[in-house]
Regions:
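Internal helix-loop-helix
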Residues: 59-60, 90-159, 163, 167
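Conserved beta-strand/loop block within the catalytic cores
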Residues: 83, 88-96, 187-193
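Glycine- and acidic
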Residues: 40-51, 75-80, 104-111, 123-132, ...
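Glycine-rich, Trp-frequent "lid" loop and neighboring beta-strands that shape
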Residues: 115, 156-208
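Short coil/turn segments at secondary-structure boundaries
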Residues: 26-31, 69-79, 108-110, 137-142, ...
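Charged, amphipathic alpha-helical interaction segments
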Residues: 63, 67-68, 130, 150, ...
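Extended, charge-enriched "interface" segments that sit outside catalytic cores
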Residues: 1-81, 85
Length: 208
């Protein structure tokens, strides 16, 4: 069977980079999870093998599910049903396949249900998914938006949202500025916290 990871050995160039050892040590916090989680690596070599296994699973799904589904997704497309947007039926099949494989929340800590992988192998997985279906990659890679909440959100917010993203249950990017569209560089809206009002004030133009 085809595999969009193992069929392209050049991908391993990134994992073999000398800086990866330091990247892994930082992400794994010197392998502090090894006594807490069965799937946590015990050293650098173990971590790299973990990443390769995840990439191999990604490559298998990409070649044998995502790519074969891509034409049907394009032909059916998303559509409105009673005022709600629905993906093409094969898109839901793709989401379920990646969800069942545990390919959501890849970079999130294990305590939230993630795989705690660095951005480098996550980006490799994203490229593999895009090779099969660039449109689905845009949906699947929305999971990295949760990095912002992880870095700046409260623990209560993390506990509420991150496990759901790691389970493949939710994630979206909603742009409502008339001149921005999918171009994030053109977003002009500013959010300013008002101490007097005790809330965030949005300054700009939004269209819903």
């Amino acid at each position: 069977m085809a595999n969009y990871y193992s069929d392209h050995p050049e991908f391993d160039f990134y994992l073999n980079h000398p800086e990866m050892k330091r990247v892994v040590e930082l992400k794994e916090r010197n392998f502090a999870d090894k006594d807490k989680y069965e799937d946590a690596p015990v050293d650098f070599d173990d971590a790299i093998e973990n990443y390769k296994r995840v990439l191999d699973i990604t490559g298998d799904i990409a070649a044998n599910i995502l790519e074969p589904n891509s034409e049907a997704v394009d032909l059916e497309g998303p559509h409105l049903v009673e005022g709600r947007m629905h993906y093409a039926s094969k898109t839901y099949e793709n989401i379920e396949a990646t969800r069942q494989a545990g390919l959501w929340g890849i970079s999130m800590p294990r305590r939230y249900g993630g795989l705690n992988m660095p951005i480098t192998p996550y980006s490799m997985a994203s490229e593999i998914v895009a090779t099969a279906d660039a449109g689905f990659q845009n949906i699947w890679s929305l999971q990295d938006c949760i990095e912002t909440l992880y870095e700046f959100g409260s623990e209560e917010q993390r506990q509420k949202y991150i496990p759901r993203v790691c389970a493949g249950e939710t994630m979206s990017m909603d742009l409502t500025e008339p001149d921005a569209g999918s171009d994030l560089q053109r977003v002009m809206l500013k959010a300013t916290y008002s101490e007097e009002e005790g809330c965030w004030l949005l300054n700009g133009v939004k269209r819903f």
